C-alpha cells in the first residue's frame, strides 16, 4: 500500500498572519512529500507490511525489518506527525483569543491548574527541545494528560502515548518567517490551534 500526501484542509495562505504562505507551501508540498516518498521507497520491497496502517507501523517499531526500521521510524514518523499537524491548525484571521474549551479545556485545567500553566509548560517543552523535534500534549496509558517532547520525527505512539496536540519545532517549520526566534513561532501557534480537533482526539484517547 503506497502512502500519499494529504491535502491541506485550508488554503496555504489561510493561516496568515501567523504562519506565512511560503512556509506552508514548502513545509507541506516539499518536506512532507519527501517523508511520504521516502517511506514508500523503504517499504516497497516488504509485502508483509502492505496491510499495516501508518499508526501500526510506528506503534511497534521492533516488528519492522531491521534493514528499514530507521527509515520507517524517521519517514513514517514524519508522515504521521505532519498529517496530524495540519489538522491541529485552523485559520484565525482576526487574531482573536484562542483557548482550550470543552472537555479538553476542563481536563487541562484539572491536570495543570490552568490553561496558562499548561501553555507555559508546553512552550518550555517546545523551546527546550535541542535541535529538531516536536512538543506534544499526550494522553498516557492511565488516561492522564502530559506534556512531552520528542527528537527528530519520533511520534509518542511508539512510547505507548496518544498525542492529542503537537507542534513541529524543526527549523523548516518557522525559519522563513521567524528566523531563529523559536519562541515567537510557538506563541503564534497558539493563535491557530484547532481545539475542536483536540477535543475529538481526547475523547477517543482518554
UniProtKB/Swiss-Prot annotation:
It comes from the Bacteria. One of its GO terms (cellular component) is cytoplasm. Its EC number is 1.15.1.1. The keyword Signal does not apply. It catalyses: 2 superoxide + 2 H(+) = H2O2 + O2. This is Superoxide dismutase [Mn]. Mn(2+) binds at residues 27, 82, 168, 172. InterPro entries: Mn/Fe_SOD, Mn/Fe_SOD_BS, Mn/Fe_SOD_C, Mn/Fe_SOD_N, Mn/Fe_SOD_N_sf, SOD_C_sf.
